Amino acid sequence: MNNGFSTGEEDSRGHADQTCCLIDDMERCRNQAGYASYSKRIQKTVAQKRLRLSSDPSAQHIYICDHHKERIQSVRTKRRRKDSEDDSNETDTDLHEFPDLYQLSVSTLRRYKRHFKVQTRQGMKRAQLADTIMKHFKTIPIKEKEIITFFVYMVKMGTNKLDQKNGIGNDTT
């Protein structure tokens, strides 16, 4: 399962003869169906985002084409990032790029949660945990000028604490 879409790797049926099961703006899509399925969860997302997509009741399957899969995923990721930025107290969020925490494993997210003592409820799914951690991550204050100044200083001096720990900066020549 990838972002709510079934990848179909566990499905042995072929999709070469099937077309997308969606009706896009009152017209049935004629693209070849891929391995992504139009699940109840995806239907809910489509309804919330007010996309003009619906499943064709005459379709014998729930597989959708890659075009619609990408369209649904792009709306989902845009919304997630927009919500996260709205919750932030920063005035200029366009200048900041944030890591994609949604790609991290659950154990890594839990380790972050433990380290920063982020309060969450028990049994959260990975996406919910990533949302909570992203909101916390954006609240961590950083002093960009100080960090850049320190970085330039370290480069000019030719020293880096991380390189020395790993044995990289210890040249004996």
UniProtKB/Swiss-Prot annotation:
Domain of life: Eukaryota
Zinc finger (Atypical): 20-68
Localization annotation: Nucleus
Region (Disordered): 73-94
A Pfam family that the UniProt record links to this protein: zf-SAP30
Residues with Phosphoserine modification: 84, 88
Keyword Membrane: no
Family recorded in the similarity comment: Belongs to the SAP30 family.
Assembly, per entry: Component of the class 1 Sin3A-histone deacetylase (HDAC1/Rpd3) complex (HDAC). Not essential for stability of the complex, recruitment of the complex to some promoters, or the deacetylase activity of the complex.
Record-given protein name: Histone deacetylase complex subunit SAP30 homolog
Organism of this sequence: Drosophila pseudoobscura pseudoobscura (Fruit fly)
Gene this protein is translated from: Sap30
